[in-house]
């Protein structure tokens, strides 16, 4: 009998209308789940990956799930809380060291970065330029200022810097000037207002993506401190991983993937020697890289076009005597 059934409720893997998340099979293979292991899903979302981990855990296994989105936590409480193997924490994965449940060490950690499909699909969350809603973009709507509050407050130079740094938007200065000019007449409050303004000032080109794509990405990353949280979360995850534990990170754009790749390489590979500098201490690797960048198969892309930009990287913490 499966442990979920022993717990006296419907196995989460058999719940109706479960949508498989991106790189589902590859994530489970990368984590290499052991029956009595302890695993952390730092970006629960709607629980797709968490369900997969639970199907491979035995009665003594443990799954810790985190998310800073209260709607995601509500789903976790509803669907996962009855399972005694599951513990739930509302917060960013950057805070995982503050969660006492992680102190015993972890056999695997998963971060599925960026905005989730439910966040994009619900206009009221304010993430999508394709659906008009309040200009919010906060993953935790109870924390920090909204995108509207920020964009109506700061100078054009700061807006331009954010659009360039986090969106690699070449027209960042033009867009920033237009935003400031428009808000002097009427402050921004809706996603459609911002998307339409950006589209109106962008030069026509061959780019197939919506003109506001990069700007919305940049503002969202800034509002949610996504890259700073990622760097803190990577450090915390490696600290909590047991020797032999696996770290699996899914990223969706080059800024995230660059941070993940460089971080894993820095802990896995000795830096190149520099004759001009004093001899460095002997490099002791902390991680072993497990393969390279993993992307969705053609079959998955046909079923889920949003997986086209997903990149999975996996690393394993070295044994103490390795």
Curated annotation (Swiss-Prot):
tRNA processing found in the keyword field: no
GO biological processes: rRNA base methylation
Annotated binding of S-adenosyl-L-methionine, by residue: 47-49, 67, 93, 112, 119
Record field: catalytic activity: cytidine(1402) in 16S rRNA + S-adenosyl-L-methionine = N(4)-methylcytidine(1402) in 16S rRNA + S-adenosyl-L-homocysteine + H(+)
Spans traversing the lipid bilayer: none
Alphabetized Pfam families for the sequence: Methyltransf_5
Protein name per UniProt: Ribosomal RNA small subunit methyltransferase H
A molecular function GO annotation: rRNA (cytosine-N4-)-methyltransferase activity
Location(s), subcellular: Cytoplasm
InterPro entries per UniProt: RsmH, SAM-dep_MeTrfase_MraW_recog, SAM-dependent_MTases_sf
EC number(s) from the headed UniProt entry: 2.1.1.199
GO CC entries: cytoplasm
Organism: Stenotrophomonas maltophilia (strain R551-3)
Keyword field: Cytoplasm, Methyltransferase, rRNA processing, S-adenosyl-L-methionine, Transferase
Similarity remark: Belongs to the methyltransferase superfamily. RsmH family.
Function: Specifically methylates the N4 position of cytidine in position 1402 (C1402) of 16S rRNA.
């Amino acid at each position: 009998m499966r442990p979920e059934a022993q717990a006296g409720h419907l196995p989460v893997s058999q719940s109706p209308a479960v949508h498989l998340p991106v790189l589902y099979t590859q994530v489970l293979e990368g984590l290499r789940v052991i029956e009595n292991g302890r695993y952390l899903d730092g970006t629960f979302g709607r629980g797709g990956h968490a369900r997969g981990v639970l199907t491979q855990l035995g009665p003594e296994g443990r799954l810790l799930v985190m998310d800073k989105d209260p709607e995601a936590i509500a789903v976790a409480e509803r669907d996962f809380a009855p399972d005694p193997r599951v513990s739930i924490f509302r917060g960013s994965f950057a805070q995982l060291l503050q969660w006492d449940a992680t102190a015993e060490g972890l056999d695997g950690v998963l971060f599925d970065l960026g905005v989730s499909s439910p966040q994009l699909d619900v206009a009221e969350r304010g993430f999508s330029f394709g659906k008009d809603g309040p200009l919010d973009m906060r993953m935790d709507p109870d924390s920090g200022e909204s995108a509207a509050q920020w964009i109506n407050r700061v100078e054009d130079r700061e807006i331009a810097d954010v659009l360039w740094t986090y969106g690699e938007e070449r027209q960042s200065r033009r867009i920033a000037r237009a935003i400031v000019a428009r808000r002097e007449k009427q402050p921004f409050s809706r996603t459609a207002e911002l998307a339409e303004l950006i589209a109106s000032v962008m030069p026509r080109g061959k780019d197939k993506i919506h003109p506001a794509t990069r700007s919305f990405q940049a503002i969202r990353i800034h509002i949610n401190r996504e890259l700073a949280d990622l760097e803190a979360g990577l450090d915390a995850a490696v600290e909590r991983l047991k020797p032999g534990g696996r770290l699996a990170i899914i990223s969706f754009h080059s800024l995230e993937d660059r941070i993940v790749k460089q971080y894993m390489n820095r802990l896995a590979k000795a830096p190149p020697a520099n004759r001009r500098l004093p001899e460095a201490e002997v490099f002791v690797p902390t991680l072993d890289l497990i393969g390279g960048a993993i992307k969705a198969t053609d079959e998955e892309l046909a079923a889920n076009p949003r997986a086209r930009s997903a990149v999975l990287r996996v690393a394993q913490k070295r044994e103490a005597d390795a």
